[in-house]
A protein has these predicted regions:
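General beta-strand structural signal in soluble alpha/beta enzymes
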Residues: 3-5, 34-38, 54, 98-104, ...
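Non-catalytic positions within long, well-ordered alpha-helices that form the structural scaffold/packing
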Residues: 27-30, 121, 140
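Generic non-transmembrane alpha-helical segments
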Residues: 82, 86-96, 182-190
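Zn-dependent metallopeptidase/amidohydrolase metal-coordination segment
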Residues: 130-168
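His/Asp/Glu-rich mid-to-C-terminal helical/loop segments that flank catalytic regions of hydrolases
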Residues: 157-193
Length: 193
């Protein structure tokens, strides 16, 4: 087991190579199962802040790949059914309300507009964030089993009547820490069996 804390973001000026470098290091260390976590904004009222979502599909809204027609990718090389099953089992045993959905990747660093959120929803997006997809792609390309968990820390712009603040994001992340730790610990134990 190897745990890495934090990540580099492209909006911080990091190149794609720098962003995915930690995944390459993990693979070189012999890591076969990769659990990626992030904070994301919920695109659905039924997935309130504090919810944890298994990423079952992803949509690239950065347009950096030359594709101008974003589509959901649910390829199993990016999203392991085995690891998802373990996560769902752990959540049931521990009373953790685990959601499923599609993660929308944007570059940031500004929060999205309500018009962008409407577009993401029209393509079946469930959550939006400014990281993670490069790591998912690299892990999949390297043949790692992947599980991505999004901690939904806020409603995305226009979903709630309340204005979005970074303080809300940090507060909700802190409030959900115990559930996330319990879930991750259980998943790791499930993988080790």
């Amino acid at each position: 087991i190897l745990v890495a804390s934090g990540r580099m973001h492209m909006y911080e000026g990091c190149s794609l190579d720098k962003v995915i470098f930690p995944i390459k290091v993990l693979k070189e260390c012999g890591i076969e199962n990769l659990i990626i976590t992030n904070s994301a904004g919920s695109l659905k009222m039924e997935n309130p802040p504090g919810s944890i979502m298994i990423v079952e599909g992803h949509i690239d809204f950065t347009f950096k790949d030359g594709i101008d027609n974003p589509k959901i990718r649910t390829d199993k090389k990016f999203h392991s059914l085995e690891l998802s099953s373990i996560a769902k089992s752990v959540s049931l045993k521990n009373g953790i309300d685990l959601k499923n959905g599609n993660y929308c990747w944007v570059l940031g660093p500004a929060y999205e507009t309500s018009l962008e959120i409407n577009y993401f929803q029209s393509l079946s997006g469930s959550a939006v964030g400014m990281s993670t997809l490069p790591e998912i792609r690299e892990g999949g390309a390297l043949g790692m089993k992947l599980l991505t968990l999004s901690l939904l820390t806020n409603f995305a712009a226009g979903i709630s009547k309340q204005p979005l603040t970074h303080e809300e994001v940090l507060e909700n992340a802190g409030n959900s820490k115990e559930s996330m730790i319990k879930l991750l610990s259980g998943i790791i134990q499930g993988i080790e069996k």
